[in-house]
Amino acid sequence: CYPTFGGSGVVATELGIALSKIGHTIHFITYHQPVRLETLNTDNIHFHEVEIPDYPLFKYQPYELALSSRLVDVVKAHAIDVLHVHYAIPHAYAGYMAKKMLIDDGFHIPIVTTLHGTDITLVGSHPFYRPAVTFSINHSDKVTAVSESLKNDTLRLFDITTKIDVITNFIDIKKIEAKVMPCKRDLLAPKSHKIITHISNFRPLK
């Protein structure tokens, strides 16, 4: 997953934490510790950093190659049962490459790909990326989308031959406390205006 405040990283992290609480061992594999992974003081949550060597030949460092190799290393070292990749680019593609490399070494691991939004509707649908995204989705063992709308967009924008199941995003309501906070609403907007709050990463699209 991406380790940022974006929805894909948050959902991936919270899902992993929730699974760890019911006895599963979770390994997060990304280029930085996820922002929602506040502690590693447990026996069944682990973080593996993807290091990207800086080689002058490359104008852009090949993160997908580094990620694929790291996935292979972690699967072999820790006997991982399943890879769950969040956000189609580049994680689904890297997951597929890791799976193929592992097969050559006698490891057979299923890939679950979760589609989150702009990885499909904005980035993934770009002509430069569409063939790789289509291939990665179709070669995943399981594909989920976070909404019916995203599922429909994926089917509309790509030639998808595999089933997509919808599993909506979630929150842990136990973390939320009902608090009444005094607020001078007129400082934000006139009474006739609605106030909408959006929380995400700080990309121009948002």
Regions found by a protein language model. Give the residues of each.
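Nucleotide-sugar donor phosphate/pyrophosphate-binding loop at the beta->alpha transition
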Residues: 103-112, 118-136, 152, 180
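Carbohydrate-associated surface elements
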Residues: 32, 149, 170
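A short helix/loop element that forms part of the nucleotide-sugar donor recognition site in Leloir-type
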Residues: 176-190
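A short, basic/aromatic alpha-helical/loop segment that forms part
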Residues: 5-6, 173, 203-206
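An amphipathic, basic-hydrophobic alpha-helix
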Residues: 56-83, 92-97, 127-131, 135, ...
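N-terminal subdomain of nucleotide-sugar transferases
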Residues: 1-35, 43-48
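Conserved donor-binding/catalytic core segment of Leloir-type glycosyltransferases
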Residues: 144, 189-206
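A short beta-strand/loop micro-motif in the catalytic core of glycosyltransferases
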Residues: 138-148
